[in-house]
Each structure stands twice: as structure tokens, then as C-alpha cells.
Amino acid sequence: MSSTRWLHRQLNDPYVSLAKKQGYRSRATFKLIEMDSKFSIFKKGQYVLDLGSSPGGWSQFAAQRVSHNNNNPVFAVDIQNMDAIPNVIFIQCDIINDIELLSDKFHNKKFDVILSDMAPKACGNKQVDHANIINLCEISLDIVVRFTRENGVFITKILQGEYEKEFYQSMKTYFQSVKYFKPKASRKDSSEMYLVGLGFKKDSQDIKTIES
């Protein structure tokens, strides 16, 4: 997309204006707000992990929803830097290569909600872009299995394509229910959707250990 077309789209996007008005760092925040309204994701006192967090819109909203007496209830992880957010601990690392670093930073903590709005840089080839985001989804699911509490929730971005159903079935192994959701805040011309895993099965951690 040319810079002129991008600027025109941004200026005419109601969610961009709304994000600025409400103090959120990105329009993507409203996708999470919709999913929380639909599935009742967040509760006070929960711990949340936000993968691919920069610039921080999802972490902002999650911290607002769960902050109670638990200081720093949200852990945010991204390969890029992210400006500080109240009640959010930011870890700058590459989740593909630094999972043991994450384990050290989490101090054996388990999360009630794990979020992933990650997407690789688009190359313009839909099949390649789809395969790349599925790879990120699989890496995120590995983290979910390792660090999620029983009955926890996992939300991940996905692009429709060849491997979509296979990944959906993988999620069903670990969650009592898996739902597709396309927020109104998603652009109409985008193939992005979200998978929402509800009710993480504690026993599924044993399945993953055996497979490994």
C-alpha cells in the first residue's frame, strides 16, 4: 500500500480517531474490547500475558480490566521496544528463541489469559503470509500450554487459509471450546480473524509433554 493510500485510510478510519480520543495506543484495542464484551475474557485480579504487545493497546486495556490488588498483573512481550504502561511489565525479547528467558522472568507464574495479536511483516503473497502467521500461532500455543492456568483463555490472530483448520483442531486439543470471531474493528478487506480458546484443560499440559 502506498503511503498516500495508507494516510487516507488512517484519516478516514473511525477507530483511529476513537483510539486517540480515548487515549489508546492503537485502533487494535477495540478488537480486544469487542472480544471481551462477547466472551467475558477479563476479571479483576487475573494475570495476563500479551505476546507481540507493541505499541501496547491490548496491554493498556488488559491492565485496566484486571488491575486490582495485584501489582503489575500484565506481562507484555515484544521483539520491538514499547513505552511503559502502568501495571504492565515489559520484556523485550524474541519469543521464538528466548522462551527460557521468559520462563525466568515469569518466576513460575501461570496466566489466566494469554493474548497474541502478532503478525509477521507481510510479503504480499497471501499463501506465504498465511503460513508465517500460522507458525507464530503454533509458537504462541506452545507458550500457552506451558504457562496457562486451568480454565484459562487464549486469543490469537489468524489469517484464513490452507492451515487454518489444522491449527483450529490443535487448539481444540487444549481448550474446552474454541470460537472464531471477526471484530467489527477488523478491516473489511482483511482476511484476519481471531480464535478464542476458552477453558484451558489442565490435563492437556501432560499431552504436550508426551508429544515433546
UniProtKB/Swiss-Prot annotation:
Its main location: cytoplasm. Its EC number is 2.1.1.166. InterPro entries: RNA_methyltr_RlmE (IPR050082), RNA_MeTrfase_FtsJ_dom (IPR002877), rRNA-MeTfrase_E (IPR015507), SAM-dependent_MTases_sf (IPR029063). CDD domains: AdoMet_MTases. The active site is at 157 (proton acceptor). GO terms for cellular component: cytoplasm. GO terms for molecular function: rRNA (uridine-2'-O-)-methyltransferase activity. It catalyses: uridine(2552) in 23S rRNA + S-adenosyl-L-methionine = 2'-O-methyluridine(2552) in 23S rRNA + S-adenosyl-L-homocysteine + H(+). The keyword Ligase does not apply. SUPFAM superfamilies: S-adenosyl-L-methionine-dependent methyltransferases. It is an enzyme of class 2 (transferase). S-adenosyl-L-methionine binds at residues 56, 58, 78, 94, 117. Keywords: Cytoplasm, Methyltransferase, rRNA processing, S-adenosyl-L-methionine, Transferase. It comes from the Bacteria. It is found in: Cytoplasm. Specifically methylates the uridine in position 2552 of 23S rRNA at the 2'-O position of the ribose in the fully assembled 50S ribosomal subunit. HAMAP family: RNA_methyltr_E (MF_01547). Belongs to the class I-like SAM-binding methyltransferase superfamily. RNA methyltransferase RlmE family. This is Ribosomal RNA large subunit methyltransferase E. It comes from Ehrlichia chaffeensis (strain ATCC CRL-10679 / Arkansas). The lineage of its organism: Bacteria, Pseudomonadati, Pseudomonadota, Alphaproteobacteria, Rickettsiales.
